[in-house]
Structure formats: structure tokens, C-alpha cells
Amino acid sequence: GISSLHDMESLPFTYSEDIAGFPSRFLCIPQKYVKRIVTLKTSGTSGTEKRIFFTEHDLSMTVDFFTNGFKAMVDENDRVMIMMPGNTYGSVGRIIKKSLDHLNIRNFIYGPLKNSDDAADFIAKNNINTLVAMPVQTMILSRIKKSVFLQNIKRVMLSADYVPEILIKKLKRLRTIHMHYLL
């Protein structure tokens, strides 16, 4: 058994191949308690996808985590456009929405960028001043719809993927940037 920190040395190390090859072996609860399963392909690699399981408690704790993080980023005067997937239960977009709802921040799940004209119209129509988006989407929107971006967007939270330093530098010239890696 494990009764001290020293005992932890006897446990085998977990490699990404273990999680990819045998995801259900990492479940410590009955499967009936799993509320969301996320399949992840690690950014920048061609490795095998990994399946991660979440309970209702895990999802709730994630909402709480983001609620606390957003307290430092937005206030009741902000209007946030969530450019993350949000169609399914426990999705990133819905978790962010719940977090912002807890703070009474007006927010909209827009979803991933598909059309820059539509996104720019959405920003203008809804008086959006804050984006939560993936880095590449933000870069595309800020270049193609620069005037709408400059007139409306005060801050951006870049998330869900690696953020290249060059993108941070370019966007910092335009806006306040926050970064966070999430599922």
C-alpha cells in the first residue's frame, strides 16, 4: 500500500502511450459516474489520441476554476464572445459560459470561427468587447477584420492551444492578452 511519499516511488510512471492505449484503466470510479469523455489530440504532435473521463464533480470544479480566473479578467460591463465549441454538455464553450454566468457577465457562445464577416457582424451587433478564442482564430479575425477588432475588442483570452510568442507580441500591440490552456 501507499502510506508515505517514499512509497510513491514504487508506483510505475504513467506515459502518454498508457493513457492513449488503455484509457479505461485510469478510471477510479464506475463508468456510470462519467458525464463527459474528451478525446484529445496533443497539439503539435502526431501521437495517438487520448481519452479523458470527467465526472459531474470534475466539470463543476472546472467551472469554479474558470469563474475565479475570469474575476481577474472581466466585470459586469463586459460582453464576452466565446469562440469555442459549445454544442455539447460539458464542452469548453459551455463550461466558460457557466463560469461567466456565475459572475453575471453577459456572454455568448459563438463557436469556432468559420466566417470572419459573420463573426465581425456578431461582434458589432452584440457590442462584444472581450473574446475567448483559440490563438489561430484570433489571429485570423484580427487581420481580416482589423477595424472591427480594434474598435470593439478590449481583451482576449487565448486558450485551447499553444500560443506562439510572435502572436502574443502582435496581439499585445492591439489588446490585453490572457492565456490559458484548457480542455
What is each of the regions a protein language model found here?
Residues 1-41, 47-61, 68:
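Nucleotide 5′-phosphate-binding alpha/beta core
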Residues 56-69, 79-139:
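AMP-binding/adenylate-forming
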Residues 95-100, 146, 167-174:
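Short, aromatic/basic amphipathic alpha-helical patches
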Residues 140-144:
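Phosphate/pyrophosphate-binding betaalpha-module
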Residues 147-152:
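Short, conserved loop/helix-junction motifs that constitute active-site signature segments
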